[in-house]
């Protein structure tokens, strides 16, 4: 967390004062490292500090503030831009406020010890991460990340051509995700992690499909379904590792998160290529302007339904896999 603080602080200041592309690139790299280190530190901290459904509840509420921050930030940014005339560069200063607050909260605090003896050793972590279950979860994680971040990067831009307001879609999606994650523990208690993930995949598929077929006000309905679908992906994939592969420890949770981010970074350029290809096909049919952008973009969104669609199959397999697994295999070994 100390590294995260310095990476965030330096990255934010560099972002404000940078006057060239390289400076902006380094600034965003530092902020990204800060984000990654924050999650890498806090996920295992929560897993070690709580047990059972309380852990699922707190993991979901920790991840609640990722979309929650986006929702609050988008509304504040819109207010400062439209009502106060404050430019984007000047708005970046606000990022230092939560940075200083979390530094105050964490510095000097004692961290909980690992609940599982093997989770505290590198050898135990690596051995657990080479099991079929962990590798299967890693595949699922890559697809959940693409299903969440893939459409999110393009939906606002594409559907703005149909009359939908991109900032409203962003705030609606992020806000609903935050609310859903607040109640994530209750959902896990009722349907179990795999049941929640399976239901999420179904809703995400419906949401992306509606994004690809609907325009105007119906885009907001699609945003609601999509938000409810992707809300539980990330925190419950992390929680799945913590509860079902406990010996992988903090390293396992960090690796799973890294797999998700890596998959997203790999597929974003591919998705961009799909948009270019669909745009060329739509242009060949005589479409131009906003109609061209909308038709080509929605064609790409339709292609993206394949990712959450595959997850429906994988999470169904995982549901029966874990249900038929011996209870003893899932219980962590008590630390000495």
Name each model feature, range by range.
Residues 89-108, 298-320:
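Symmetry-related core transmembrane helices of the 12-TM Major Facilitator Superfamily/SLC fold
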Residues 127-178, 265-272:
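Extracytoplasmic gate region of multi-pass secondary transporters
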Residues 1, 180-193:
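Helix-to-loop junctions at the C-terminal end of transmembrane segments
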Residues 27-64:
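Cytoplasmic helix-loop-helix junction between adjacent transmembrane helices
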Residues 53, 58-114:
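Helix-loop-helix hairpin linking two adjacent transmembrane segments in secondary transporters
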Residues 6-19, 203-214:
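C-terminal ends and interior cores of transmembrane alpha-helices
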Residues 195-237:
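C-terminal transmembrane helical hairpin of 12-TM major facilitator-type secondary transporters
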Residues 16-27, 212-222:
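Helix-loop junctions at membrane interfaces in 12-TM secondary transporters
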């Amino acid at each position: 967390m100390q590294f995260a603080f310095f990476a965030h602080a330096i990255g934010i200041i560099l972002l404000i004062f940078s006057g060239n592309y390289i400076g902006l690139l380094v600034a965003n790299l530092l902020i990204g490292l800060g984000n990654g280190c924050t999650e890498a530190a806090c996920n295992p901290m929560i897993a070690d500090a709580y047990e059972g459904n309380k852990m699922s509840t707190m993991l979901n509420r920790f991840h609640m503030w990722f979309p929650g921050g986006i929702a609050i930030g988008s509304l504040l940014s819109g207010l400062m831009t439209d009502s106060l005339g404050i430019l984007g560069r000047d708005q970046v200063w606000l990022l230092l406020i939560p940075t200083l607050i979390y530094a105050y909260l964490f510095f000097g605090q004692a961290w909980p010890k690992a609940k599982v003896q093997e989770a505290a050793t590198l050898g135990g972590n690596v051995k657990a991460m080479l099991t079929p279950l962990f590798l299967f979860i890693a595949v699922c994680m890559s697809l959940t990340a693409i299903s969440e971040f893939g459409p999110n990067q393009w939906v606002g831009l594409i559907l703005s051509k149909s009359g939908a307001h991109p900032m409203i879609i962003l705030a609606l999606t992020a806000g609903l995700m935050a609310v859903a994650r607040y109640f994530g523990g209750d959902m896990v208690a009722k349907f179990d992690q795999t049941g929640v993930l399976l239901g999420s995949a179904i809703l995400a598929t419906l949401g992306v499909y509606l994004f690809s077929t609907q325009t105007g006000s119906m885009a907001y309905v699609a945003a609601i379904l999509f938000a409810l679908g992707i809300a539980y992906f990330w925190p419950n994939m992390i929680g799945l590792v913590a509860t079902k592969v406990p010996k992988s420890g903090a390293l396992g949770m960090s690796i799973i998160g890294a797999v998700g981010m890596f998959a997203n970074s790999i597929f974003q350029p591919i998705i961009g290529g799909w948009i270019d290809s669909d745009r060329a096909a739509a242009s060949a049919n005589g479409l131009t302007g906003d109609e061209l952008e909308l038709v080509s973009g929605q064609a790409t969104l339709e292609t993206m339904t394949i990712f959450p669609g595959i997850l429906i199959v994988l999470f169904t397999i995982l549901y029966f896999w874990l249900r038929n697994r011996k209870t003893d295999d899932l219980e962590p070994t008590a630390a000495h």
